[in-house]
C-alpha cells in the first residue's frame, strides 16, 4: 500500500520550486547582473533574492499542505510526485509571467508618477502593494491548478471538508496556518497604506520585511499547532469550520494589535527615558518573548471561548 503523507509532498513542492529558482538565477539572471555589477558575488546575489522569496516559500509550504490535504493528494506514489513537480513548474511559469507583467506595468506607471512629481512614499507603496497582490494571485492560481490536477489527473475522491476521522487536528492545523499567512499579508498591506500618513513615515519595500514576516508566520503557526492539538474538538466527526475560522481571525487580529502596542510602548519608553543608546539585541528578544507569550495566551483564550459556545 502506498504510504499516506501530509508534509512530504508539500516539502517536495517547495524544494523543487527553490531548485528551479536557483537554477534560473545561476544560469540566466546572475550572468546579466554581474555584467552591470561586477563586484556583486553569486552568494550575495542569491541571498538577496532568496530574502525576497522567503515570504512566498514559507507561505507555499503551509498553503500547499492545505491544498494537497483538502483535495486528498496524500498518497506518496509516482503519479502524485509527477503531479507535484508539474504544479511546481506551473507555479514558477505563472510567477515569471506575472513578474514580467509587473515590471512592464510598473515601469510605465512609475515613469508617469515621476513626471507628475509624485511623492517617493507613493512609489514605494505602489511597489509593495503590487508585490502583495501578485503573491495572492499566484496562490489562487495554485489552488485552481491543484483542484484540476486532483480531479482530472489523479482522479481522487475527496470529502472536501470532512476528514477521514484519523487525524482531524491536522486539517485544522493546515487550515489555520493558511489563514494566518493570508492575515500576515493583509497586515503588511495595511501597514503599507497607513505608514505614509504617520510623521516621517515611508513604507519599506516588501523584501525589507521578509525575515520578520517569515519568522512571525512560523511563530504564529507554531502557536496554533499547540493550541489546535490541545483544544480542537470534533462534533459527530464533522469539522467545525465556523468557530475555527472566527477563532483564528480573532486571535491573529488581537495578536497583531498586541504586538503593535508592545512595539509602540517600548519605543515611547525608550524615547522618554533617553535610553535608546543602550537598547540592543537583548531588549528585542525580550519584546519577542513577551509578544509570543501574549499571543499564546490570546489564542488559547479565544479558541476556548469560541468552542464552548
Locate each region found by the language model:
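Alpha-helical transmembrane segments and immediately adjacent membrane-interfacial amphipathic helices
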Residues: 5-32, 48-70, 83-109, 127-155, ...
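Short, Lys/Arg-enriched, Gly/Pro-containing loop segments at transmembrane-helix junctions
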Residues: 160, 308-309
Amino acid at each position: 500500500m502506498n504510504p499516506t503523507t501530509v508534509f512530504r509532498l508539500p516539502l517536495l513542492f517547495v524544494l523543487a520550486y527553490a531548485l528551479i529558482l536557483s537554477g534560473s538565477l545561476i544560469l540566466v539572471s546572475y550572468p546579466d547582473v554581474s555584467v552591470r555589477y561586477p563586484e556583486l558575488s553569486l552568494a550575495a546575489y542569491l541571498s538577496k533574492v532568496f530574502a525576497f522569496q522567503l515570504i512566498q516559500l514559507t507561505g507555499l509550504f503551509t498553503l500547499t499542505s492545505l491544498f494537497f490535504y483538502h483535495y486528498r493528494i496524500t498518497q506518496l506514489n509516482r503519479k502524485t510526485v509527477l503531479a507535484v513537480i508539474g504544479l511546481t513548474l506551473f507555479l514558477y511559469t505563472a510567477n515569471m509571467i506575472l513578474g514580467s507583467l509587473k515590471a512592464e506595468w510598473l515601469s510605465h506607471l512609475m515613469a508617469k508618477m515621476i513626471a507628475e512629481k509624485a511623492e517617493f512614499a507613493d512609489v514605494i507603496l505602489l511597489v509593495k502593494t503590487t508585490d502583495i497582490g501578485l503573491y495572492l494571485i499566484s496562490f489562487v492560481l495554485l489552488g485552481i491548478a491543484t483542484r484540476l490536477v486532483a480531479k482530472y489527473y489523479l482522479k481522487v475522491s475527496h470529502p472536501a471538508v470532512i476528514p477521514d476521522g484519523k487525524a482531524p487536528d491536522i486539517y485544522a492545523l493546515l487550515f489555520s496556518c493558511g489563514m494566518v499567512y493570508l492575515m500576515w499579508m493583509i497586515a503588511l498591506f495595511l501597514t503599507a497604506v497607513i505608514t505614509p500618513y504617520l510623521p516621517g513615515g515611508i513604507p519599506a519595500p516588501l523584501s525589507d520585511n521578509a525575515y520578520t514576516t517569515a519568522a512571525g508566520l512560523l511563530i504564529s503557526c507554531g502557536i496554533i499547532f499547540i493550541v489546535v492539538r490541545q483544544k480542537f474538538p470534533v462534533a459527530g466527526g464533522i469539522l467545525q469550520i465556523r468557530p475555527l475560522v472566527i477563532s483564528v481571525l480573532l486571535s491573529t487580529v488581537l495578536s497583531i494589535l498586541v504586538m503593535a502596542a508592545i512595539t509602540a510602548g517600548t519605543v515611547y519608553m525608550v524615547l522618554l527615558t533617553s535610553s535608546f543608546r543602550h537598547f540592543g539585541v537583548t531588549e528585542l528578544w525580550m519584546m519577542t518573548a513577551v509578544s509570543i507569550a501574549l499571543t499564546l495566551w490570546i489564542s488559547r483564550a479565544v479558541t476556548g471561548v469560541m468552542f464552548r459556545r
